[in-house]
Amino acid sequence: MKKQNKPIISNLLVGSDPEVFLWNNVNNEFHSAVGFIKGTKKKPLQMDNLPKGFMWQVDCVALEYNIPPAKNEGEWIAYHKQSLKYMKEHLPEELDLVIQASARFNANHLNTKQANTFGCDPDYNVWKGEQNTPPDAIDNLRVC
């Protein structure tokens, strides 16, 4: 029997919801995103004048953004560039976006409930099918 090379999935779309940190160029420190935008994990904020699906919200102390489903790599990259440009244009001038996995924050940026909320709500263990217990904040390290 001859094997056929047919795609298993057709019309695959790829989205994304990465986080970025804020760096304060005046104080030379990482700055909490809490209070800069009204978007939350439960109610993300649509980015003005961009198509449906471009959203942003606070996640712990980071800014999280969402892109619409992309049909190909070029579209996916373009959506990320649009989102990063939008966020930079809508933040105070002294704040820059920093793309890295983790950052240490001064204690004055960690005194809100939001700054001490980690992970998805709720978050599940895929192997056990059970809800995970959210991690506790141990020090001033925050991760994306």
Describe every region a protein language model picked out.
Residues M1-V143:
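Terminal catalytic/cofactor-binding subdomain
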